[in-house]
């Protein structure tokens, strides 16, 4: 671990409500620490809120000597006793102070050369939060979340993100909580439902506030706390991204950290989280604020006309898309293809190694039998399914199936790699994200399927079954409903998605149409392969999109999910005898499936 100066750490346990903790910070903590800095006894300080062993403040003071630290601890302990306490099953005492060494999360903030800048940002974040809390309305009630949203917008703006980039970044940050296991969180469905209800009620006001803030940051007329935070972020990011070393050539001042754009965005997501923490925003509130801010940034509808899911005007999004994505005869230059961009990997912690997945051979069954046997399965799905069976399903449907030689006009030969389904430009941008629930020989988890190497790439833990069921009403209906699909004992759930970011770079607006076609081709191939293996399922094209992308770890704009495909073995084939192929709800929307 690397840091600058000598930091002294105090853990002050304050078993109090958030508002009382705010008041204590303003009345007792900040004046004392600022006085130490003003007297030259410390060169800076910051704090965070924490819950381990009981609610407490972690206070870090730089270059504070032992005597000064002891006096500070004693004064804060006495002052804390006067703050109202709330009962709780914690092993700490209200007002207790512990001296605990400060151990920075160096890698999380960009490495040793970037850490000094991170620590300065912690101090700037502390000052901004205290200033916002000291305002006449403070952060009481919903005002706290309004301040948080403003600071989220200000962070993205200061990093040079336009509205689309900012929305993507904020959504990624909110979705990242899906992989956190150390903190108890609300189910994703609860957070998304709250975001959607607030957005529906306040869409216009939220959009106006965000636009006004961005304009104010551009002209220097924004409110003081978002403005000061944006200035601090802009200056710090310039140092983090700069390639020149510090004045002594060591980078000790944080200059020359040379962080890439992707790593910088990842680092600033951590800084945004700590800003919310200091403000007293809970993780679930943080998820909601970031999602709400992101949705606001993508708003383009007329403020006076509420959005409709069934628009009839010429301005309807689907009408405009179909018109603008056409290949126009005589105007080939407008739709000329572009070179394919290289695939990008998301910055972040090192991933676990890929998991090799063997594949059993396909059984020798007649095509007519497979075609006749492929139909959507209602009722409970179950195993058994083992690793070789899963490999057979995935790689016989997804992976390379053959090669051929193509002689070109100049006489050279090009080798074409084939898979069992067609793909625009042979880019194979239809992909599969996999939830392994109960498959022998494969650890439960969330995986990305890598057909090129016939491996599973670990993405994270598998979500709780109840959260998977919340993705579609087909999965959450009572077992007595004839259209219920039971996944309590299902071995796997597949998510078929498109790498639209890659496809769009080559085909522009045509890419979405091509992606929809390819994911349909792949899904049918998966279903036929499943039928040959004695498996069945229902491809669900209607699901709760934002929640599904979050649970599967997909970027909803660059990696749009097209189908959820729970697979397993039918419990009793006879139960299907009376099911109509066009049963209730066979259309789209969260209640729509496919037959």
Regions found by a protein language model. Name each.
Residues 534:
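Structured binding elements
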Residues 73-76, 408, 510:
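"Short basic amphipathic alpha-helical interaction patches in structured regions
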Residues 522:
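Gly/Thr-rich phosphate-binding loop signature of adenosyl cofactor/nucleotide-binding cores
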